[in-house]
């Protein structure tokens, strides 16, 4: 207040000094006025004095029509005033040819009236939050709206007649500006009427938010039309109105928001009426039955949102007109709402009792696998690998002090079985061979068997895999829903809390299956990376001896499996001459596998033949 008084006194002193100086030079009234209008410093001082007078007039009118302004109203006024002053300066650059004291006075008057329109809008919006409205408040607002409406209409009429008589000029800008201010006065008046009707009723008016929403939609559409017409005319007649870009953008954004709010509110209210269940008395008693929107107790007519918060139906309807979220947790009710269930088609009256619904399919029980085996991989994970059984351990190569078993016996013990009985026999033979190799007197440690939980080695590796670590079992894949009827699927879908929890649990199960599959793959790759390349076979004899050994090993596979005997524990004497394999020329060639490469068992048998060849010769 003190700064305002100092500024007013300084402006008044400067104005008096300038006028006295001009009169001292000219000594007459008319020459003094001419001198003041032609002198730029004198005009600057007079402009400052005019602004001070306008400021004082605004203070007086504010006291008359508003009384004491609130802090929020002053903040909004200053924020909008800065933008208005910037737009006015841009308008001065567009109409620099028409720049004159009259032009400045018209823009100052326009800014002055805009300030009162903004204050009237804020004060009417305050009616909704104020519990007590006095008659003085009504008299002030009604008289202010009446005065602003008359002034806006007069300035629009003046601009219209000026354009008709003098052509397109700066009055085109003022005409459209005052027309937009008239739409603002119309919006303020409708809101005032709605708030007044709501204050007169004891209970809250449910339809007030609907009328306010459609009022903003209607007035926003009018503003958009006015700005589009103004931009089109200004571009054709004068130039591009740069100062009108920001208010036009704000008007279009406000109109778009009004349209979106109207659509979303209708959708939210429709969902509330169709999807949200009514709150039962038990639910109201089990929780705090005070509606946080109106702060009144809920007895009847309450709705429960998908987030399990309960409110009055009328309060929710008014709330959804403004925003489509839960008043408590801010959950988007449009995204959380599920589509309504389609009612089942009516059944004919002459039909018998409906058949019993099919029971939901039970999840398959996990099969029992032998110790150290994994369940098979899900179908489609490794399509090129056929299912394989447990791979038998390989007996270690005999040391120098131990006897060498006949090739036919080793081949029969290491050959892959084809049936269950053969599998048992082969496993027993391999176990006996391992026990013989690791018995007392052996000079080498036993080789590691297959990895527990990993039933097969890589197809290109000849040595058994070391046990890396224990693998967790593969989870059982979930069952499908192909056998369910549409009615059962609708019943399983559901819209309650337990159905949502079931869906979340299914997603967690899928996540667990994916994690288990990736874990198995990573463990398999880790085992492969930890193993080195296969050791090359040592060349003991010449090329002729190697070929003879290979043919002899091939002939040993033609001996029936019934003639194969299991070696006994302990060291055995060298094989006699009659037990040696037949000559190579009397043996046919062995059939190779389909892929043209010998398998792991064949490679191991050949190595045993190479180690045995010095003893044979």
Swiss-Prot record:
It catalyses: S-ubiquitinyl-[E2 ubiquitin-conjugating enzyme]-L-cysteine + [acceptor protein]-L-lysine = [E2 ubiquitin-conjugating enzyme]-L-cysteine + N(6)-ubiquitinyl-[acceptor protein]-L-lysine. Zn(2+) 2 binds at residues 307, 309, 326, 329. SUPFAM superfamilies: RING/U-box (SSF57850). CDD domains: RING-H2_synoviolin. GO terms for cellular component: Derlin-1 retrotranslocation complex; endomembrane system; endoplasmic reticulum; endoplasmic reticulum membrane; endoplasmic reticulum quality control compartment; Hrd1p ubiquitin ligase complex; Hrd1p ubiquitin ligase ERAD-L complex; membrane. Residues 480-535 are annotated as: HAF-H domain. GO terms for molecular function: ATPase binding; DNA-binding transcription factor binding; protein-folding chaperone binding; ubiquitin protein ligase activity; ubiquitin-specific protease binding; unfolded protein binding; zinc ion binding. It is an enzyme of class 2 (transferase). Residues 1-4, 63-98, 162-169, 246-617 are cytoplasmic. It is found in: Endoplasmic reticulum membrane. Residues 1-251 are annotated as: Involved in FAM8A1 interaction. Residues 1-84 are annotated as: Necessary and sufficient for SEL1L interaction. The chain crosses the membrane at residues 5-25, 42-62, 99-119, 141-161, 170-190, 225-245. It holds the Pfam family zf-RING_2. Residues 341-375 have a biased composition (Pro residues). Its EC number is 2.3.2.27. Residues 417-451, 537-569 have a biased composition (Low complexity). Residues 236-270 are annotated as: Interaction with p53/TP53. Its main location: endoplasmic reticulum. Zn(2+) 1 binds at residues 291, 294, 312, 315. Residues 591-600 have a biased composition (Acidic residues). It is linked to In certain aggressive cases of activated B cell-like diffuse large B-cell lymphoma (ABC-DLBCL), plays a role in the degradation of misfolded N-terminal mutated PRDM1 proteins. E3 ubiquitin-protein ligase which accepts ubiquitin specifically from endoplasmic reticulum-associated UBC7 E2 ligase and transfers it to substrates, promoting their degradation. Component of the endoplasmic reticulum quality control (ERQC) system also called ER-associated degradation (ERAD) involved in ubiquitin-dependent degradation of misfolded endoplasmic reticulum proteins. Also promotes the degradation of normal but naturally short-lived proteins such as SGK. Protects cells from ER stress-induced apoptosis. This is E3 ubiquitin-protein ligase synoviolin. It comes from Homo sapiens. The gene is SYVN1.
